[in-house]
């Protein structure tokens, strides 16, 4: 269910203050400002999970180390040479959270698959080749299991890692 400005938001606790706070305090403002759209997964009137999406792009910088060139070549491997660009269209998963009492039931994986299907369907008005995420360290294994790859090695010591999924691989 898409969050609208008049959608009531019941209590939600995924165990992460930032993710809880986004849903409670920021999601409607992001919608109003046209920065992101949040989708709720509900059982009866209880929010069990949510994710938010915004458009993004995978961009090649002009200064690349050899390792980054290798990573960028992996991104473009399935794109014909004549169609390769410096920026590829993407959708970013800005937030994804599952309430604590529903963790471990595969809801996160189902949300990732729903995002994939949303952008593989013919209902979208713009091209979108990749899904991106700035994954918390605690979620790196989750995204890895869902076939996301690291975009760079520069963020190995950061709190989040840039990751991508190629929709063409589905």
PLM region spans:
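Short amphipathic alpha-helix that is part of the acyltransferase structural core
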Residues: 1-29, 33, 38-40
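Conserved beta-hairpin
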Residues: 35-54, 67-68
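Short hydrophobic/aromatic beta-strand element in the GNAT-like acyltransferase core
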Residues: 36-40, 50, 90, 95, ...
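Conserved acyl-donor/pantetheine-binding loop and adjacent beta-alpha core of acyl/acetyltransferases
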Residues: 52-95
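A short, internal acetyl-CoA/4′-phosphopantetheine-binding micro-motif in the GNAT/acyltransferase core
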Residues: 94-104
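Conserved acetyl-CoA-binding loop-helix of GNAT-fold acetyltransferases
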Residues: 104-118
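Catalytic cores of nucleotide-enabled group-transfer and carboxylate-activating enzymes in metabolic
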Residues: 120, 146-147
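C-terminal "cap" of GNAT-fold acetyltransferases
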Residues: 127-138, 146, 152-170
